Amino acid sequence: MRSRLTITALALLVGMAAAPVQVLAQSSDGTNSSVSKVLASSGAGFNVAAVRSLLNRGDAAVASGNLDQAKTDYDNARTAAKQLLAFYRDLSGAFRGLDARIPREMDSKGREALSLLAQANLRLAALFRRQNQPEVAVPVLVEVVRLMTPASSEGQKAYQSLIELGFVETPFAGAKSAK
């Protein structure tokens, strides 16, 4: 829990430092006429766009052969996606039964964060396989199957990787539609 708060605080500081800060001007009725949404900025905030940015940076690092940087970026994307998922779930639960719009929004954002977590895990597992560390890839792949279910395309890719590694032997019959 302490590391989650530390990482969250760090992400907030980075997001605030990288995004321009606007002064909030209030109109006579008390509403903000110019709201600065620092955490919503793409790439620099604490949101799914920032996770996508980390994944893209990791992909670029892999393409340039910098596997250590790629691992760092994928790990950071994974951590941020897990935190976002937990926060969205917490907010969804807090507002359930009070205002249906908020849980719907949080559930939608949570599904997006979950998908990004699965993508980060798949990329991290591929990196571990490339570095001849299949034993490190296995738990990450199992997490994808558990989170996304074997019927999803991400779950099928993860399970297929587990077969290729020799961790499991029985092919999944529902995997015929995977691409």
Model-inferred region functions:
Residues 49, 69, 97-98, 109-116, ...:
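Structural signature of alpha-solenoid helical repeat junctions
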Residues 28-29, 96-112, 163-179:
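Alpha-helical linker/edge segments of TPR/alpha-solenoid repeat scaffolds
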Residues 72-102, 143-160:
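Short, charge-rich amphipathic alpha-helical segments embedded
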